């Protein structure tokens, strides 16, 4: 509450210096029982919305640059689920928490797979599984252990 233009600029400078690629950002709203509810909030909703847009835009830009830097790299990906949009495609998270999409005939949900990043469009990362035979053996072994 009550963030000045100077304080907001300091926040923006910090975000640029650290080079955040993700952030959960929202407009301040008082929460009952918290110390912040006692502070004066003289920032208009219009300014709050403008600042949030600016902050989210810079983080989005930084995220796109970071995602593009992954192109051509090999990433270890923990497979989370099937794509709801594309048949035969799965997605998972790399160690940097970026979501990676890839095609597979095998179901590797819950397994790690090695993926070569082959394209990045805006902030959407696509790749191809490498070492698929090794991963299939690992998957089958995990399934046998579970029985």
Predicted regions and their residues:
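Conserved C-terminal portion of the radical SAM core fold
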Residues: 1-34, 54-65
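Terminal RNA-binding accessory module
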Residues: 38-147
């Amino acid at each position: 509450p009550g963030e000045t233009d100077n304080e907001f600029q300091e926040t923006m400078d910090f975000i640029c210096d650290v080079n955040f690629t993700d952030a959960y950002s929202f407009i301040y709203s008082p929460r009952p029982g918290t110390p912040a509810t006692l502070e004066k909030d003289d920032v208009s909703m219009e300014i709050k919305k403008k600042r949030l847009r600016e902050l989210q835009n810079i983080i989005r830009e930084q995220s796109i640059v970071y995602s593009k830097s992954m192109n051509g790299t090999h990433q270890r990906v923990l497979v989370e689920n099937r794509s709801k949009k594309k048949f035969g495609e799965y997605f998972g998270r790399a160690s940097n928490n970026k979501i990676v999409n890839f095609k597979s005939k095998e179901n590797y949900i819950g397994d790690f797979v090695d993926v070569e990043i082959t394209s990045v469009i805006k902030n959407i990362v696509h790749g191809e599984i490498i070492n698929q035979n090794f991963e299939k053996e690992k998957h089958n072994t995990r399934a046998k252990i579970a029985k």
